[in-house]
Amino acid sequence: MRIEEDLKLGFKDVLIRPKRSTLKSRSDVELERQFTFKHSGQSWSGVPIIAANMDTVGTFSMASALASFDILTAVHKHYSVEEWQAFINNSSADVLKHVMVSTGTSDADFEKTKQILDLNPALNFVCIDVANGYSEHFVQFVAKAREAWPTKTICAGNVVTGEMCEELILSGADIVKVGIGPGSVCTTRVKTGVGYPQLSAVIECADAAHGLGGMIVSDGGCTTPGDVAKAFGGGADFVMLGGMLAGHEESGGRIIEENGEKFMLFYGMSSESAMKRHVGGVAEYRAAEGKTVKLPLRGPVENTARDILGGLRSACTYVGASRLKELTKRTTFIRVQEQENRIFNNL
């Protein structure tokens, strides 16, 4: 046993220090990034935000809606090959280039993903997702996927420390997904005691990945557009959002009505709700590590997308970054004990 004494920080522990700027307007900020990925060699340009691969977020409808904002969607793994074919038949190449195909690590997952990728060459992203990216089996699966799909851009996770981030990149991942336990409907930290404050995880993993020519996506922990800005400021190349994009018309959750008001169910992918839906229930050897919440219906996702992108542009103007790429270079975090004046929050 050992104890690390240095303090680890989450998004709520810091603010971004403002700096002198020559920008005249938020409209002067360029949010689009251009990337060429280490292993696939693929080039991509767009806004580096990703809708999470949850079945109450990462839907085909979400992908179609967010593509118009140049935002990616990691489409959840529970669609059938036939459903994928129907989506592809009704989608433009511009939509498909903003889609990630999500997969688990079983043999069945691998075969199904292979069939999906064979449907259309415009599907260039694979998102290999497990709760615990520290297993040897997961590393071997990433290497297997890289060998099978040498020209596909592979995103793999989740991990929270530099050494494992490096291991996944060396095994074939172009992008490493960073985050254990910070999600709004994730209970891993309270069920297991395992986790890592998200901002510190992003900073550590970004440093490790960039040293090898890889990239990271900060997955989880964002509750506001300001948190998204902090993730980019900490060095994330991409930011993945779940809860912030849940509860919309495109989110895919089950709608219920109580006292004349409509709500949408949103749950973690290791929750009892998810396991009942997809595998028949919680196996007797494990515990559910997610929760289910009721969200008031929030309308179309385009309004939320505009709010997030507007907040990002504003953050860039506060530190003098004319491009999103410059945000991390212009970011100085200050540790704080308060984030906002909450006097009217309950009104």
Swiss-Prot record:
**What PANTHER family does UniProt report for this protein, alphabetically?**
GMP REDUCTASE (PTHR43170:SF5)
Q: Which family is this protein grouped under? A: Belongs to the IMPDH/GMPR family. GuaC type 1 subfamily.
What is annotated as the active site? 186 (thioimidate intermediate)
Protein name (Swiss-Prot/TrEMBL): GMP reductase
Source species, domain of life: Bacteria
**Which sites bind NADP(+)?**
108-131, 216-239
Which SUPFAM superfamilies does this chain map to? Inosine monophosphate dehydrogenase (IMPDH)
Q: What is its EC number?
A: 1.7.1.7
- So what does this thing catalyse? IMP + NH4(+) + NADP(+) = GMP + NADPH + 2 H(+)
Look up keyword NADP and say if it applies: yes
Q: Which NCBIfam families match?
A: GMP_reduct_1, PRK05096.1
Gene Ontology process terms (BP): purine nucleotide metabolic process
Q: How does it assemble?
A: Homotetramer.
* GO (cellular component) term, any one: cytosol
Which Gene3D superfamilies does this chain map to?
Answer: Aldolase class I (3.20.20.70)
Q: Which organism is it from?
A: Escherichia coli O139:H28 (strain E24377A / ETEC)
Under the heading SMART domains, the entry gives: IMPDH
Identify the residues that bind K(+).
181, 183
Q: Which GO terms describe its molecular function?
A: GMP reductase activity; metal ion binding
User: Which gene holds the coding sequence for this protein?
Assistant: guaC
**What HAMAP family would the database entry show?**
GMP_reduct_type1
Q: Which Pfam families match?
A: IMPDH (PF00478)
Keywords of this protein's UniProt record, alphabetized?
A: Metal-binding, NADP, Oxidoreductase, Potassium
Q: InterPro entries given for it?
A: Aldolase_TIM (IPR013785), GMP_reductase (IPR050139), GMPR (IPR005993), IMP_DH/GMP_Rdtase_CS (IPR015875), IMP_DH_GMPRt (IPR001093)
Question: What does this protein's UniProt record list under function?
Answer: Catalyzes the irreversible NADPH-dependent deamination of GMP to IMP. It functions in the conversion of nucleobase, nucleoside and nucleotide derivatives of G to A nucleotides, and in maintaining the intracellular balance of A and G nucleotides.
